[in-house]
Amino acid sequence: NIIYELRPMSVDDFGFKNAIMNMIDKFNRESNVITYYSSINFDDELSIDSNLIISILRIINELNSNAIKYSNGTEIIVNVTLKDNNVIIEFKDNGKGFDYYNTVYDRNKNSGFGLTMLKERVALLNGNIKYIYDNGSDFFIEIPVW
Protein backbone atom coordinates (compact mmCIF):
# COMPACT_ATOMS: atom_id res chain seq x y z
CA ASN A 1 0.00 0.00 0.00
CA ILE A 2 2.77 2.48 0.88
CA ILE A 3 4.53 1.90 -2.43
CA TYR A 4 1.22 2.24 -4.29
CA GLU A 5 0.54 5.54 -2.51
CA LEU A 6 3.96 6.87 -3.50
CA ARG A 7 3.70 5.84 -7.14
CA PRO A 8 0.45 4.23 -8.28
CA MET A 9 1.26 1.63 -10.93
CA SER A 10 -1.93 2.37 -12.83
CA VAL A 11 -0.50 5.75 -13.87
CA ASP A 12 2.30 4.13 -15.83
CA ASP A 13 0.33 1.11 -16.96
CA PHE A 14 -3.07 2.51 -17.85
CA GLY A 15 -2.89 6.30 -18.24
CA PHE A 16 -4.50 9.21 -16.43
CA LYS A 17 -8.17 8.45 -17.08
CA ASN A 18 -7.92 4.80 -16.06
CA ALA A 19 -5.81 5.68 -13.01
CA ILE A 20 -8.62 7.94 -11.76
CA MET A 21 -11.27 5.33 -12.55
CA ASN A 22 -9.25 2.61 -10.77
CA MET A 23 -8.82 4.83 -7.72
CA ILE A 24 -12.55 5.59 -7.51
CA ASP A 25 -13.34 1.89 -7.97
CA LYS A 26 -10.95 1.18 -5.07
CA PHE A 27 -12.75 3.79 -2.92
CA ASN A 28 -16.08 2.12 -3.76
CA ARG A 29 -14.82 -1.37 -2.87
CA GLU A 30 -13.41 -0.19 0.45
CA SER A 31 -16.52 1.67 1.60
CA ASN A 32 -19.61 0.12 3.10
CA VAL A 33 -21.27 3.47 3.77
CA ILE A 34 -20.46 5.82 0.89
CA THR A 35 -21.67 5.46 -2.68
CA TYR A 36 -19.42 7.00 -5.33
CA TYR A 37 -20.47 8.58 -8.60
CA SER A 38 -17.91 9.74 -11.11
CA SER A 39 -17.53 11.33 -14.50
CA ILE A 40 -14.18 11.55 -16.25
CA ASN A 41 -14.50 13.70 -19.36
CA PHE A 42 -11.35 13.86 -21.43
CA ASP A 43 -9.47 11.87 -24.01
CA ASP A 44 -7.01 9.46 -22.41
CA GLU A 45 -4.54 10.17 -25.20
CA LEU A 46 -3.51 13.33 -23.34
CA SER A 47 0.17 13.74 -22.77
CA ILE A 48 0.34 14.87 -19.15
CA ASP A 49 3.47 14.61 -17.03
CA SER A 50 3.25 11.56 -14.75
CA ASN A 51 4.30 13.64 -11.71
CA LEU A 52 1.37 15.98 -12.34
CA ILE A 53 -0.96 13.00 -12.66
CA ILE A 54 0.27 11.61 -9.34
CA SER A 55 -0.26 15.00 -7.68
CA ILE A 56 -3.82 15.12 -9.01
CA LEU A 57 -4.48 11.59 -7.74
CA ARG A 58 -3.14 12.59 -4.31
CA ILE A 59 -5.44 15.62 -4.28
CA ILE A 60 -8.47 13.43 -5.00
CA ASN A 61 -7.31 10.92 -2.38
CA GLU A 62 -6.96 13.65 0.28
CA LEU A 63 -10.43 15.01 -0.50
CA ASN A 64 -11.81 11.49 -0.22
CA SER A 65 -10.02 10.82 3.09
CA ASN A 66 -11.42 14.03 4.57
CA ALA A 67 -14.94 13.26 3.35
CA ILE A 68 -14.81 9.78 4.89
CA LYS A 69 -13.43 11.03 8.21
CA TYR A 70 -15.47 14.18 8.74
CA SER A 71 -18.50 14.62 6.48
CA ASN A 72 -20.84 11.87 7.74
CA GLY A 73 -22.13 11.78 4.17
CA THR A 74 -23.37 8.85 2.15
CA GLU A 75 -22.55 9.99 -1.39
CA ILE A 76 -19.49 11.39 -3.12
CA ILE A 77 -19.38 12.73 -6.66
CA VAL A 78 -16.05 13.07 -8.45
CA ASN A 79 -15.98 14.84 -11.81
CA VAL A 80 -12.72 15.35 -13.68
CA THR A 81 -12.70 17.27 -16.96
CA LEU A 82 -10.24 19.02 -19.21
CA LYS A 83 -11.10 22.58 -20.20
CA ASP A 84 -8.88 25.25 -21.72
CA ASN A 85 -5.69 23.29 -20.90
CA ASN A 86 -6.75 22.88 -17.27
CA VAL A 87 -7.76 19.79 -15.36
CA ILE A 88 -10.93 20.63 -13.45
CA ILE A 89 -11.73 18.50 -10.42
CA GLU A 90 -15.11 18.76 -8.75
CA PHE A 91 -15.36 16.75 -5.55
CA LYS A 92 -18.71 16.90 -3.79
CA ASP A 93 -20.17 15.06 -0.82
CA ASN A 94 -23.61 15.23 0.77
CA GLY A 95 -22.25 15.48 4.31
CA LYS A 96 -22.41 18.18 6.95
CA GLY A 97 -19.91 20.60 5.38
CA PHE A 98 -17.57 22.84 7.34
CA ASP A 99 -16.08 26.32 7.58
CA TYR A 100 -13.24 26.02 5.05
CA TYR A 101 -11.63 29.37 5.83
CA ASN A 102 -11.38 28.80 9.59
CA THR A 103 -10.28 25.19 9.17
CA VAL A 104 -7.44 26.04 6.79
CA TYR A 105 -6.32 29.42 8.13
CA ASP A 106 -6.85 29.24 11.92
CA ARG A 107 -3.45 28.15 13.25
CA ASN A 108 -4.77 28.02 16.82
CA LYS A 109 -6.72 24.88 15.99
CA ASN A 110 -5.13 21.47 15.86
CA SER A 111 -7.02 20.51 12.73
CA GLY A 112 -7.08 21.18 9.03
CA PHE A 113 -3.57 19.92 8.29
CA GLY A 114 -4.73 17.75 5.39
CA LEU A 115 -6.64 20.64 3.86
CA THR A 116 -3.69 22.97 4.38
CA MET A 117 -1.44 20.51 2.57
CA LEU A 118 -4.06 20.19 -0.16
CA LYS A 119 -4.16 23.97 -0.59
CA GLU A 120 -0.36 24.11 -0.75
CA ARG A 121 -0.17 21.22 -3.25
CA VAL A 122 -2.69 22.96 -5.53
CA ALA A 123 -0.75 26.24 -5.24
CA LEU A 124 2.53 24.51 -6.13
CA LEU A 125 0.84 23.27 -9.30
CA ASN A 126 -0.20 26.88 -10.12
CA GLY A 127 -3.80 25.87 -9.58
CA ASN A 128 -6.63 27.28 -7.54
CA ILE A 129 -9.16 25.82 -5.18
CA LYS A 130 -12.67 26.97 -4.40
CA TYR A 131 -14.91 25.58 -1.67
CA ILE A 132 -18.67 25.96 -1.50
CA TYR A 133 -21.01 24.63 1.16
CA ASP A 134 -24.07 23.41 -0.72
CA ASN A 135 -25.80 20.59 1.15
CA GLY A 136 -22.35 19.18 1.81
CA SER A 137 -18.87 20.11 0.72
CA ASP A 138 -18.20 21.04 -2.89
CA PHE A 139 -14.60 21.57 -4.00
CA PHE A 140 -13.63 22.98 -7.39
CA ILE A 141 -9.96 22.65 -8.21
CA GLU A 142 -8.39 23.92 -11.42
CA ILE A 143 -4.85 22.89 -12.38
CA PRO A 144 -3.06 23.89 -15.60
CA VAL A 145 -1.63 20.94 -17.51
CA TRP A 146 0.64 22.84 -19.96
What are these regions (language model features)?
Residues F16-L52, E120-A123:
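Helix-loop-beta hinge of the Bergerat
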Residues N1-D13, S71:
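Flexible helix-coil linker/loop segments in the cytosolic histidine kinase module
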Residues E75-N85:
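Short beta-strand/loop element within the Bergerat-fold HATPase_c
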Residues N86, G97, D134-F140:
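Glycine-rich nucleotide-binding loop
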